[in-house]
Amino acid sequence: WKIPLDAKDVFRRKAPPSKRETAFYLLIDRSGSMGAGIGGGNSKLFTALATAAVLEEALKGIAYTKIVAFDGGTNAVEHCVIKDFDQKEIGSRCMDAMTQIAAGNGNKDGYSIRAAALDLAKRTERRKILMVLSDGLPSGYFSEAEAIDDVRTAVQAARRRGLLVIPIIYTARTDENVDAYRRMYEKSMIFADSVGMLGEFERLLMKLVR
């Protein structure tokens, strides 16, 4: 085959849309239990950050993305911003965070979901997606019933605002865990132990950003 001398688009790739219509908020649980390994391998926090790094890279030029790690307890919650919506998309901030962020204390997911939803609701993009990467029942509450009720209320409020809420779950897929997550999130759950998880992500992303 031959390339004309005056060809100007030999190595040109198709440019992303000039206007991004989607905003993503990745909310990562960095509570103490996330420091435990999965099947003797890397910690759940490391795996969650690796998942977020894949999403961060895939969404470059397609969506505005904010990434936050959270922990806390009954009376205090800390949010660590890994990447803000309008920061330059250079390198991988999630990969950098792997050596800078450690598992902390408890997690009060309902509070953090509300804070993320308020932030995301201010965006002007047509689609607004909140992904919660966590490993189980929030520990920053006085009881399991209180934890489940608070998360469910926060998720329902976010959905009423027009946000799509998707939990990515880093825990064993037991009947008990599935039931607890279903009571909190009701739908759209992705378990990180799924063999076809990457395929699920790919299909999900293509569906969400179209």
Label every PLM stretch briefly:
Residues 1-210:
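Acidic, glycine-rich A-domain
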